[in-house]
A protein has these predicted regions:
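N-terminal export leaders
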Residues: 4-9
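Short, low-complexity N-terminal intrinsically disordered segments enriched in polar/charged residues
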Residues: 11, 19-51
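Short, solvent-exposed secondary-structure junction/capping segments
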Residues: 41, 45, 50-73
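Surface-exposed, charged secondary-structure patches
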Residues: 60-123
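Low-complexity, intrinsically disordered terminal/linker segments enriched in charged
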Residues: 107-111, 115, 119-128, 134-135, ...
Length: 158
């Protein structure tokens, strides 16, 4: 009885002292991100082409999806290339992806950050996805490639 009480007290103290960021993220957020990167790891995989409005809306929250779609439509009318001239998930146009590691942490109510590290053509790459949970699942709110501008900033500044 005393041993059980000590265990419960120690467990309670451990939980109370654990940093908030160390609490496990929603497993569905991790599954969402892992599903994004799975097609890149298959030999001759097609990745995740953002060639339709439905595809864009599947991965991005509504405001970012609208920015991407509007930009793509304007570029098509001009006969030009859209602002997003590379694959935003891997920060490249070509790929041979290996050693993918996905780390997701909760950052608030219905929000999370996923840090995705991988090798592309042998070069270490890290992409950070800001995630938001909507009624129909997790979506990307922004992408940071370690440069000055994020995905959202590419379209807002334009």
């Amino acid at each position: 009885m005393i041993a059980r009480r000590r265990f419960l007290v120690a467990l309670g103290i451990g939980i109370a002292l654990a940093p908030i960021g160390a609490i496990a993220a929603d497993p569905s957020a991790t599954s969402f991100v892992e599903a994004i990167y799975a097609p890149y790891q298959v030999k001759d995989g097609k990745g995740n082409p953002l060639d339709s409005d439905a595809a864009v809306k599947h991965y991005f929250e509504p405001r970012v999806a609208a920015l991407i779609i509007r930009d793509r439509n304007k570029a098509a009318k001009r006969g030009d290339v859209s602002t997003l001239d590379m694959d935003p998930f891997i920060d490249a146009q070509d790929w041979d992806i290996s050693a993918v590691d996905v780390a997701v942490r909760d950052t608030g109510a219905e929000k999370a950050v996923a840090t995705v590290s991988f090798k592309n053509l042998g070069k270490p790459t890290t992409v950070v996805l800001d995630l938001v949970k909507l009624r129909d699942g997790w979506r990307i709110a922004d992408i940071n490639w370690g440069r000055k501008r994020t995905l959202r900033a590419l379209f807002i500044k334009r």
